[in-house]
Design a protein with these regions (language model features):
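Conserved glycine-rich cofactor-binding loop
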Residues: 16-17
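Conserved glycine-rich Rossmann-like NAD(P)H-binding loop of the short-chain dehydrogenase/reductase
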Residues: 30-45
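A short, exposed helix-loop element centered on a Lys and neighboring polar residues
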Residues: 121-122
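Active-site loop of short-chain dehydrogenase/reductase
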Residues: 8, 79-81, 128-137
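Conserved NAD(P)H cofactor-binding loop of Rossmann-fold oxidoreductase domains
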Residues: 87-94
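The beta1-alpha1 cofactor-binding region of Rossmann-like NAD(H)/NADP(H)-dependent oxidoreductases
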Residues: 57-68, 103
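Substrate-binding pocket helix/loop in short-chain dehydrogenase/reductase
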Residues: 94-98, 102-107
Length: 137
């Protein structure tokens, strides 16, 4: 039995590099409409090759902008079937002592790595429930 993903859609955070870029490519190659979210743009050739991908430059720590961007995608696609959170940063040495971490840096890392996932869940889960389908990674 061959799986069909026709008509499915996905949102990928941290989508312009590493794991996020590879996942976006794989999903696009399986006919899934992909909304790529990141602060940096993917290579222009990537978007030309992967016609099922669209990119939006966005700060994942800005709840209102995320909600607006996702709502536009949802209205067009009529569903959000998959959410893949690959956003993550480490802006200090992994071996640094907790007493030496700058509080402002730690707050921003926490917002990006954890708070953004909660924001996305809060925005997307109700849409998945409405459509009685969804998967988050």
């Amino acid at each position: 039995m061959k799986l069909s993903f026709k008509g499915k859609s996905a949102i990928i955070t941290g989508a312009s590099g590493g794991m996020g870029l590879k996942i976006s490519e794989k999903l696009s190659n399986n006919n899934i409409s992909v909304l790529m979210l990141d602060l940096k743009s993917p290579n222009k050739d990537f978007l030309k090759k992967n016609k099922n991908c669209q990119f939006k430059k966005i700060d994942v720590t800005n709840y209102n902008k995320m909600k607006s961007c996702i709502e536009i995608f949802y209205q067009k696609q009529k569903s959000i079937d998959y959410l893949v959170n690959t956003t993550g940063v480490l802006w200090f040495n992994k071996d640094i002592s907790a007493v030496d971490i700058n509080n402002d840096v730690w707050d921003k890392v926490f917002q990006i790595n954890l708070k953004s996932m909660m924001y996305l869940s809060k925005i997307i889960i109700p849409k998945m429930k409405k459509n009685k389908f969804g998967s988050m990674v």
